[in-house]
C-alpha cells in the first residue's frame, strides 16, 4: 500500500531479511526495561511509611509513563523493517523492446461503417499509439494485403512510422500468415543488433485487421495465420490482435456491394495460439482505447523496487513522538 507523505509500504520481498534478527535485540531491551521497572518498584516499597513515600515521590500519570518507552521500541521495530529492505512492484518504461505494428490494407478497409472509413481511422489511431508509446521502444510497421511489406524497420524514430502510416495504399487479398512471418523476421533481425542484455529484447506483434484471411484460405496451411501464430508462440512473441469494424460493413467493387463483416473469431484464435490478447473495436474511440491499453501493457515493465523509505519515515515520526511523550509525560527522555 501507499500512504500519503510516507510512500509505498510493503511487508514482502525483503532483500536483507537477516536484519530481522535485530528483533531479538529489541526484545532484550524490552526485557531489561521491564526488569528495571520491577526493581525500581521493589526499591520504592522498602519505605515503611507509605504516607511519607507519597509525599516525597513526584506526581506522575503512572498509567501513561510507559508510553515513551513503548513508542521507542516501536520505532526500533520500524527501523528494523526498513533495514530488512522490503520491496514492491514498480512500473518503469521499457528501454529495450521491439513492437511490430502490422496493419491490414486489403480492400475491405475501404468500408465506411467506421467514419470516415476503416483505413483512415486505423491510421489516426496508429499514429496516436506511436506518439504515446514509451520512447525507448523500437517500433516497426508492416502493411499487408496479398503480400506483406516492411515499411519501417523497428526504430525509436516515431516520425518515420507516422510518415509511413500516411502513405498506406489499398491492395487485394489478405495474407495474414505471411504478415506475421514477416514481422517475426523483422523482430529477429533487429534483436540480433540491439544490445543491453544476454537475451533477445522482449517483442510483441500488434496485428490490426478487419477480415478473414483469404490467402491461403486454410489458416492451418504452412503459410496460414494459425501456423504463423504457433510459430510466434514458439519464439516467445505474443500477438495482440485488434479486429476493427462492424458486422455491417460493405464496399463497392465494380458497382456491386460486397459485405465485409469484421471477423472476430479468426483474430481471437490467432491471439490465443500465440499467447497474446485479442481486442475488438467498432469505433475510432474504441480503437483509441484499445491502443491506450496496449501502450500500458507494452510500454512498461514491472520490477521490484525498494520500499524501505516509507518505513524509515514512519520510524522517524514514531521516534519523535517518543521523545515528545517523554518530555510531556515524564519530563525526561525514556530510560
From Swiss-Prot:
Keywords from the named record: Cell membrane, Membrane, Transmembrane, Transmembrane helix
Source taxon at top rank: Bacteria
Topology relative to the membrane: Multi-pass membrane protein
Membrane-crossing residue ranges in chain numbering: 18-38, 67-87, 309-329
Residue ranges occupied by any VWFA domain in the UniProt entry: 98-294
CDD domains associated with the record: vWFA (cd00198)
GO cellular component entries: plasma membrane
Location of the protein in the cell: Cell membrane
InterPro entries xrefs: UPF0353 (IPR022933), UPF0353/GerABKA_families (IPR050768), VWF_A (IPR002035), vWFA_dom_sf (IPR036465)
Annotated HAMAP family: UPF0353
Family: Belongs to the UPF0353 family.
The protein's name: UPF0353 protein MMAR_2288
Source species: Mycobacterium marinum (strain ATCC BAA-535 / M)
Amino acid at each position: 500500500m501507499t500512504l500519503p507523505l510516507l510512500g509505498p509500504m510493503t511487508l514482502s520481498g525483503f532483500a536483507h531479511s537477516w536484519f530481522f534478527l535485530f528483533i531479538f535485540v529489541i526484545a532484550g531491551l524490552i526485557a531489561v526495561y521491564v526488569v528495571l521497572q520491577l526493581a525500581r518498584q521493589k526499591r520504592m516499597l522498602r519505605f515503611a511509611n507509605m504516607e511519607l513515600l507519597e509525599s516525597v515521590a513526584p506526581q506522575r500519570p503512572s498509567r501513561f509513563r510507559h508510553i515513551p518507552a513503548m513508542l521507542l521500541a516501536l520505532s526500533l521495530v520500524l527501523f528494523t523493517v526498513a533495514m530488512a529492505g522490503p520491496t514492491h512492484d514498480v512500473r518503469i518504461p521499457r528501454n529495450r523492446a521491439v513492437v511490430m505494428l502490422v496493419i491490414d490494407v486489403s480492400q475491405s478497409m475501404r468500408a465506411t461503417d467506421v467514419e470516415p472509413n476503416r483505413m483512415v481511422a486505423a491510421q489516426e489511431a496508429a499514429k496516436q499509439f506511436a506518439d504515446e508509446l514509451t520512447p525507448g521502444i523500437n517500433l516497426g510497421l508492416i502493411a499487408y494485403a496479398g503480400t506483406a511489406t516492411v515499411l519501417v524497420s523497428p526504430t525509436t524514430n516515431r516520425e518515420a512510422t507516422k510518415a509511413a502510416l500516411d502513405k498506406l495504399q489499398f491492395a487485394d487479398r489478405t495474407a495474414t500468415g505471411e504478415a506475421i512471418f514477416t514481422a517475426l523476421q523483422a523482430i529477429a533481425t533487429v534483436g540480433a543488433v540491439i544490445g543491453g542484455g544476454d537475451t533477445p529484447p522482449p517483442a510483441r506483434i500488434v496485428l490490426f485487421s478487419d477480415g478473414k484471411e483469404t490467402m491461403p484460405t486454410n489458416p492451418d496451411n504452412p503459410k496460414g495465420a494459425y501456423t504463423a501464430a504457433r510459430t510466434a508462440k514458439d519464439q516467445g512473441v505474443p500477438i495482440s490482435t485488434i479486429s476493427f469494424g462492424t458486422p455491417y460493413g460493405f464496399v463497392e467493387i465494380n458497382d456491386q456491394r460486397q459485405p465485409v463483416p469484421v471477423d472476430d473469431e479468426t483474430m481471437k484464435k490467432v491471439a490465443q495460439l500465440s499467447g497474446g490478447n485479442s481486442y475488438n473495436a467498432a469505433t475510432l474511440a474504441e480503437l483509441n482505447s484499445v491502443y491506450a491499453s496496449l501502450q500500458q501493457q507494452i510500454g512498461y515493465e514491472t520490477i521490484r523496487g525498494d520500499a524501505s523509505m516509507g518505513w524509515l519515515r514512519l520510524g522517524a515520526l514514531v521516534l519523535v513522538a517518543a521523545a515528545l511523550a517523554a518530555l510531556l509525560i515524564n519530563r525526561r527522555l525514556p530510560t
